[in-house]
Amino acid sequence: MEAYGIAGHNYVKLRDIGKAVGFNVFWDADSGCVQIETDAPYTGEAPSAEAVPSAAAPSDVDAAKQDIVARTNALRAERGIAALAADDQLMRAAQVRADEMAATGTYSHTRPDGRKYYTVTDCRQVGENIHQIPLLYLAQQKTALAETLVYSWSKSAGHMENMTDESYAAIGVGLARGTDANGMECWYCVQLFLRSGYSISAVDKPATK
């Protein structure tokens, strides 16, 4: 490893250390500084955009939805609260909410056409959690969507209250790919909850602006 003498001190290039030790060092033009990736082998190049996962297969999305339901029920079990049943109509409604947000970029409990979120069903006894997660964040953190979602919701008092509300008996989950306000690819994620003793007989189509 070549050292350089400057003003009586010896210096070694950071990229040479990266090569020798086995971590990546690269110049990040966006931030205007050198970046270090301790968990990646040396290439001298910034990570490519291919690090962001491609569109998930339907089976993967279905598995993520089931995982979200399971993780939510695990939180309830820890508190001695009855599990939520995955309701087909509520699952459809949650997917409509995720789809309409992804299609319009409207990240809100208000639907793209200005109506309240619960108008996606014919029952007002419905609660909603929403989240927007960039794909790049999941790739950088190396965490699964379901794990990240439920953990994030559990750290928010209002979202956690919905997930552990004893008056809710059923759950629906919707996931859709879209872009956020900055143009970054992201997941639009929805949980819908239905109070005990109520049912849904109709689900609306996705709303537009």
Mark where each language-model region is.
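Extracytoplasmic/secreted proteins, especially bacterial periplasmic and envelope-associated proteins
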Residues: 12-16, 63, 67-74, 85, ...
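Short, well-ordered surface patches within globular domains
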Residues: 60-119, 166-172, 176-178
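Primary recognition of N-terminal secretory signal peptides and signal-anchoring hydrophobic helices
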Residues: 1-56
